[in-house]
């Protein structure tokens, strides 16, 4: 049975849209960025023990260890969230997970699907800095093909030949 942190991390990153080959264990989720880079994502407490209010992202070189570390506070990403009808939180609450005597749960405010997507986007933007863009450009960028045709003789026929070959390549 997975724990609360694993469930939340899997919900955020298990679809492989932000990280490849995600694996969640304990308070951490691991994934692949490219051939040599991995990422570890953890819920951490930044201010009060037992209040997990941030995600710590560690980019790891699989041979040489840590490359970069970033802490993304949920309150910075999502802002304070209103708790209607609760006089204790008139100005809202920064989303965080708390340790309620050994039971971990969201405190006062449970993130919406839009909130989860906002967190995914923030994490994705940070990790994009480290991704190998060569493969992406190859897949999504314009294609350039050289087709050799003699420019002497029947030039019109040679141009027609080149156009036909180009259409074959791009279909």
Where do the model's predicted regions map?
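Functional cleft and adjacent loop/helix regions within the main domain
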Residues: 14
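Catalytic phosphate/metal-binding cores of nucleic-acid and nucleotide-processing enzymes, i.e., regions
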Residues: 140-171
